[in-house]
Swiss-Prot record:
Name the record gives this protein: NADH-quinone oxidoreductase subunit B 2
Family: Belongs to the complex I 20 kDa subunit family.
Cofactor note: Binds 1 [4Fe-4S] cluster.
Gene name in the database record: nuoB2
Cofactor(s) demanded: [4Fe-4S] cluster
Membrane topology label: Peripheral membrane protein
Keywords carried by this UniProt record: 4Fe-4S, Cell inner membrane, Cell membrane, Iron, Iron-sulfur, Membrane, Metal-binding, NAD, Quinone, Translocase, Transport, Ubiquinone
Length: 199
């Protein structure tokens, strides 16, 4: 078989050998992404020292939860366009373990993107109540954070934190997909820091 492969290769051509994967390199530091994260540093230190590591169940559950966050879309206005862009190939939020779900019963995170009106507030609370514990909420954009341009309108809720508890606020009008992605990464750090068993 090897003789056939070498017979098909032109004279003087080198065999193709893939380079060893080096991970995603941070252009600012030149190190792999996550090299400054204390969680991963501790895991790498234990693995290089012993060849295995011992972890508490809570740490294991927290680690698994940060890499498998399922988000419920609650797009109410123009911020929803930027929220949709987060799942497109340029940003690809699923590589961070952040995938969309259509049902609140399968979701861990709800992204409130846009202007929350008084008529929509009960629906927001109902969807939030249908999500399993532990559940997290990201408030995206000026309107969801505090009413935005419509703050003094008679029909607008002045911030969705009056209806549901908010974990991460993403400012902007509308915030870019990069800003939302940064908010997702902050939520993952918050989950790692606080844990998921007791919140």
């Amino acid at each position: 078989m090897q003789q056939q492969a070498s017979a098909m290769r032109p004279e003087g051509a080198q065999p193709l050998i893939a380079r060893a994967p080096s991970g995603i390199i941070d252009p600012n530091t030149g190190k792999p992404v996550g090299a400054d994260d204390p969680f991963f540093l501790g895991v790498n230190r234990e693995l290089s020292d012993k060849g295995f590591f011992v972890a508490a169940t809570d740490d294991l559950i927290t680690w698994a939860r940060t890499g498998s966050l399922m988000w419920m879309t609650f797009g109410l206005a123009c911020c929803a366009v930027e929220m949709m862009q987060l799942s497109m190939p340029r940003y690809d939020a699923e590589r961070f373990g952040f995938a969309p779900r259509a049902s609140p019963r399968q979701s861990d995170v709800m992204i409130v993107a846009g202007t929350l009106t008084n008529k929509m507030a009960p629906a927001l609370r109902k969807v939030y109540d249908q999500m399993p514990e532990p559940r997290y909420v990201i408030s995206m954009g000026s309107c969801a954070n505090g009413g935005g341009y419509y703050h003094y309108s008679y029909s607008v809720v002045r911030g969705c934190d009056r209806i549901v508890p908010i974990d991460i606020y993403v400012p902007g009008c509308p915030p870019t997909a990069e800003a939302l992605l940064y908010g997702v990464m902050l939520l993952q750090k918050k989950i790692r820091r606080t844990g998921t068993i007791e919140r």
